[in-house]
């Protein structure tokens, strides 16, 4: 039997042996049914299998999907039209790192326009988990590969924030599913300020076209622009109209520029070409990050 070359999601309920999730299987729906979009699960990476279960220790971790998740609404006729190589993929595992500076700013990167999935969309640095890697090691490796930031586990504090069920394209109106992931969001707290970290930033232009540091006030505005809702997004009057960003040229040269805050508050379009925005999964992770700040303030 050919060795599996990717880490895949496996599911377990009620102490049953973990089974490899199917590409068309709703991971969130497996635990909460079709009506709900969020579950609380256990997760572990064992023998190159990412196992999600319903036996909770230490409260479990949140798992969420978009209200418009394509897997949730895929019809039987659409499902049978998918190519066999897509159907046989299983559900991949990704990791994304929310790097928090000592002055409580988060690093986001804009995906290069040449990337196959989610081009020009703002996300935390991240990528696939490789064989025999731990989640944190995978996150640190991806951070280094995409941004040039070389952090060792002993100089940061880390915690798992939550899990996001990601499907690309993100809506059926845009196209049938080609990729299905569970993204693990890990919070990394650095003892350096964002300016100190910025001095070491060397983004890979094949992956990243811009970087930005966001604070809690801006993040609150970003997450208020809930994807799938129709109401007009209200940007608080006390926020600046634009924010400073570091652009990355195709040859890797960095330059300072500005970006309208309204771009970061864009919603995912219902159809047609995607637009520059913060990804839906990232908004979920940013909401979880805000809760950690609130908890820290309460403890303080």
From Swiss-Prot:
A motif (Nudix box) lies at residues 127-148. One of its GO terms (cellular component) is peroxisome. It is an enzyme of class 3 (hydrolase). The keyword ATP-binding does not apply. Mg(2+) binds at residues 142, 146. It comes from the Eukaryota. Signal peptide: none annotated. Residues 88-239 form the Nudix hydrolase domain. InterPro entries: NAD-cap_RNA_hydrolase_NudC (IPR050241), NUDIX_hydrolase-like_dom_sf (IPR015797), NUDIX_hydrolase_dom (IPR000086), Nudt17_dom (IPR033716). GO terms for molecular function: metal ion binding; NADH pyrophosphatase activity. Its EC number is 3.6.1.62. It catalyses: a 5'-end (N(7)-methyl 5'-triphosphoguanosine)-ribonucleoside in mRNA + H2O = N(7)-methyl-GDP + a 5'-end phospho-ribonucleoside in mRNA + 2 H(+). PANTHER family: NUCLEOSIDE DIPHOSPHATE-LINKED MOIETY X MOTIF 17 (PTHR42904:SF1), NUDIX HYDROLASE, NUDC SUBFAMILY (PTHR42904). Belongs to the Nudix hydrolase family. This is m7GpppN-mRNA hydrolase NUDT17.
């Amino acid at each position: 039997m050919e060795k599996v070359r990717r880490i895949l999601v496996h599911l377990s309920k009620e102490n049953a042996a973990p089974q490899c999730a199917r590409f068309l299987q709703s991971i969130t729906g497996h635990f909460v049914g079709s009506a709900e979009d969020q579950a609380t699960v256990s997760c572990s990476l064992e023998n190159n299998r990412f196992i999600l279960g319903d036996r909770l220790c230490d409260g479990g971790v949140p798992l969420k999907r978009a209200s418009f998740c394509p897997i949730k609404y895929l019809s039987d006729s659409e499902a049978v039209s998918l190519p066999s190589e897509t159907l046989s993929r299983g559900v991949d595992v990704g990791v994304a790192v929310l790097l928090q500076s000592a002055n409580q700013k988060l690093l986001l990167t804009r995906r290069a326009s040449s990337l196959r999935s989610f081009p020009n969309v703002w996300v935390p640095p991240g990528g696939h988990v490789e064989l025999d890697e731990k989640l944190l090691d995978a996150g640190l490796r991806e951070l280094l590969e995409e941004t040039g930031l070389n952090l060792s586990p002993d100089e940061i504090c880390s915690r798992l924030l939550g899990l996001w069920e990601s499907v690309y394209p993100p809506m059926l109106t845009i196209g049938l599913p080609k990729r299905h992931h569970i993204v693990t969001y890990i919070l990394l707290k650095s003892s350096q300020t964002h300016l100190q970290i910025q001095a070491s930033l060397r983004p890979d232009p094949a992956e990243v076209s811009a970087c930005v540091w966001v604070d809690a006030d801006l993040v609150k505005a970003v997450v208020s622009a809930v994807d799938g809702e129709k109401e007009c997004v209200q940007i608080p009057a006390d926020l600046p109209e634009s924010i400073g960003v570091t652009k990355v040229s195709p040859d890797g040269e960095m330059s300072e520029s500005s970006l309208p805050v309204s771009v970061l508050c864009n919603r995912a379009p219902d159809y047609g070409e995607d637009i520059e925005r913060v990804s839906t999964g990232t908004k979920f992770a940013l909401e979880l990050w805000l809760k950690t700040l609130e908890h820290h303030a309460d403890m303080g």
